[in-house]
Structure formats: structure tokens, C-alpha cells
Amino acid sequence: VYRNTKQILEYIQSVGYNISIGENLRDGVEVHEAIIANEEDELQYLKKLIDEKDEEVVGILTKTKEHSHFLNSKLTAKENIKIMTINEAQGVEFDVVCLTELSREVFVPSHEDEQLQLEKRRVNKDLIYVALTRAMSELHVVGRESLREIVNKL
């Protein structure tokens, strides 16, 4: 957890994760959370972020492979921009992370066996935590609703 700035850890705690925040952490920028209406808004946000970042390695993380492929097909390829699923990002760290594809439809399972639903919710909550902790300096969270609302449903 020490890779993250104080602001990133405070954000993770504020959206509903029970983590302890140590002393003497690096100070950084506030987490950027953007509520978007559709894929076009998401693409605009990501294009602006990509244009601003020339030096830092940026990880754009999705839950599904389909969305990862979609973003790869729509966004300019730059050496420092990595688009991948959260699963693919496990064990990797980035200067900047942008977590995308945040919606209840994607992360909160329904219409399934109750035990399976509980297990999927736990796994998805863990996945979101993994995504959030990949960021060393800057974190962007982009979705159709706030991350807190999604985590509270898991």
C-alpha cells in the first residue's frame, strides 16, 4: 500500500474500504472522480487525460476485455498509455491510473443464485480495490455513478 499517496488512500477509505492509513505517506493530488453519461463522455475524458500525460505511465483499467478492446480501438496509441483489464493489471503499478467502466450493471451481479451472487460481489469489490491501488501518484475514477454507490452495493 505504500506505493500510493495519502490522497489516494484516503479516497479508497472514503468509498467504503476498511484500510488503515500509515504515517509519513507521500503527499499528492486529490483523486479525480468524474460522473459521465455515456461512452462518448468517457472517451472525451480519456482523450483529454492522454493529451496531458507525456512522461507518466498511465494505466487505463477496465473490468471487461470487451471494454478494453473498445478503448484500444478508439484512443490514440502512445507508448506511455496502457489499456488493460483490472485482472491484467494485478501486480503492476502505474504513475497514473484511470479506472473506467464503473456502473452497477458491470460490477453488481443480479439474477443469479444467491450464493454465487455474494461471491461475485466479493470478488468485484476486491477487483476495484486492486485497480485503485495500482496508482502511485494520481488516480482518476470515471463512471456512470459514484464509486461509493457501487462499492456500497457490493
Could you say what each language-model-derived stretch is?
Residues I36, M84-I86, V142-R144:
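Conserved beta-strand termini and adjacent loop/short-helix elements that scaffold enzyme active sites
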Residues Q7, H69-L71, E149-I150:
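Phosphate- and divalent-cation-binding pockets in alpha/beta enzyme and binding domains
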Residues S103-L154:
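C-terminal accessory regions
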Residues E40-E114, L118, L127:
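Conserved helicase/translocase motor-coupling segment
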Residues V1-A37:
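Conserved coupling/interface region of RecA-like P-loop/ASCE motor cores
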Residues I8, G91, A131:
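Hydrophobic, well-ordered secondary-structure elements that form the walls
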Residues G28-V31, E79, E93-V96, A135-E138:
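Short glycine-/polar-rich loops that comprise or flank the Walker A/P-loop
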